[in-house]
Amino acid sequence: MKTAHEIRPGNVIMFNDSPWVVQKTETTRSGRNAAIVKMKLKNLLIDSSTETTFKGEDKMDVIVLERLDCTYSYFADPMYVFMDSEYNQYDVEAENVGDAAKYIVDGMEETCQVTFYEGKAISVEMPTTIIREVGYTEPAARGDTSGKVMKPAKLVGSDIELMVADFVKEGDKIEIDTRTGEFKKRVN
């Protein structure tokens, strides 16, 4: 059992006698400092969604699910297709992929964790760090060397724009933290 404020996107909880995957959570504090947790939930059995509110201390049953390491194969709208080491393919609905979708690109080498409930793939979790190539960034600003100088950059194969260190150039490979979406370091 977990409290509502410990629940994260990707967790599966029992709610109204059905398993629901948590797609989004938002915690706010009321005037008396009690936490209120709003959750967007998707029912795994009847393919419906709902938004509901819980008190932060409400207890919930979290279901332990099977997880497999898989690699991304291709996108067949509205499904992302992943493959395990034994070449079995698994379809994951685009809305269940969540924020991980922005990091998924053709030819990616990183292994994702696909979560299953009763044999159905229900979510994808990216590794905590990934390596991507910088597709566009401005040249380094001359003379601006005081402190941690950052500039915007776009990645190859995605719409992601993030702030990178001033010394990063087009074509460089960089490491990105998928939890925060922030630049960590240049790799090459």
UniProtKB/Swiss-Prot annotation:
Annotated keywords: Cytoplasm, Elongation factor, Protein biosynthesis
SUPFAM superfamilies per UniProt: Nucleic acid-binding proteins (SSF50249), Translation proteins SH3-like domain (SSF50104)
Compartments (UniProt record): Cytoplasm
One of the GO BP terms on file: peptide biosynthetic process
Recorded GO CC terms: cytoplasm
Gene3D superfamilies cross-referenced by the UniProt entry: 2.30.30.30, Nucleic acid-binding proteins
Pfam families per UniProt: EFP, EFP_N, Elong-fact-P_C
Recorded superkingdom: Bacteria
InterPro entries linked to this entry: Elong-fact-P_C, NA-bd_OB-fold, Rib_uL2_dom2, Transl_elong_fac_P/YeiP, Transl_elong_KOW-like, Transl_elong_P/YeiP_cen, Transl_elongation_fac_P, Translation_prot_SH3-like_sf
Pathway: Protein biosynthesis; polypeptide chain elongation
Family: Belongs to the elongation factor P family.
The protein's name: Elongation factor P
Species in which this protein is naturally found: Shewanella amazonensis (strain ATCC BAA-1098 / SB2B)
Highest classification ranks of the organism: Bacteria, Pseudomonadati, Pseudomonadota, Gammaproteobacteria, Alteromonadales
Gene, per the UniProt record: efp
